[in-house]
Regions:
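Beta-sheet ligand-binding and adhesion/scaffold domains
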Residues: 75-118
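A generic beta-sheet turn/junction motif
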Residues: 30-32, 41, 80
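Short, solvent-exposed coil/turn segments at beta-strand boundaries
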Residues: 20-22, 38-47, 69-72, 89-97
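Contiguous, well-ordered beta-strand patches that form the walls/edges
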Residues: 54-89
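Beta-turn initiation residues at beta-strand->coil junctions
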Residues: 28-30, 48-52, 78, 101
Length: 118
């Protein structure tokens, strides 16, 4: 219950403001993994698809939370249906992305790469 409350508070906090990536699609390209993230207009939902790498073909729609870190830099996190957890630190100005994700089998991955609008 506390996690649900916390997620609701984050959602409410951002209800009146939307991040600049809202309504846009981006490609993240890391060494060994490429994915697209399509952010919905609501500032809460995102569709992802891993297009290259060992997890290619994985796709879904998730609810995400976001927090500004610095000018143009955002922490974005979500949990996928298979219980994988993902955290991005995306610098939309510089076009860079850092991803930290844990697979359903609890393998931790740390990736660094590029970010570009499609």
């Amino acid at each position: 219950m506390p996690v649900v409350w916390w997620l609701q508070e984050i959602t409410n906090m951002h209800a009146s403001t939307l991040p600049p990536f809202t309504g846009k699609t981006f490609e993240v390209r890391y060494d060994g993994l490429t994915a697209t993230n399509a952010y919905a207009e609501d500032g809460i939902h995102m569709r992802y698809e891993i297009t290259e790498g060992p997890f290619a073909g994985a796709r879904g729609e998730v609810a995400y939370t976001w927090q500004p870190v610095a000018d143009g830099i955002y922490a974005i996190s979500w949990q996928e249906a298979a219980r994988s957890t993902v955290v991005h630190i995306d610098d939309f100005g510089a076009g860079t992305s850092r991803s930290f994700f844990t697979t359903a089998s609890l393998e931790l991955h740390r990736l660094e790469g590029s970010l570009r609008a499609l």
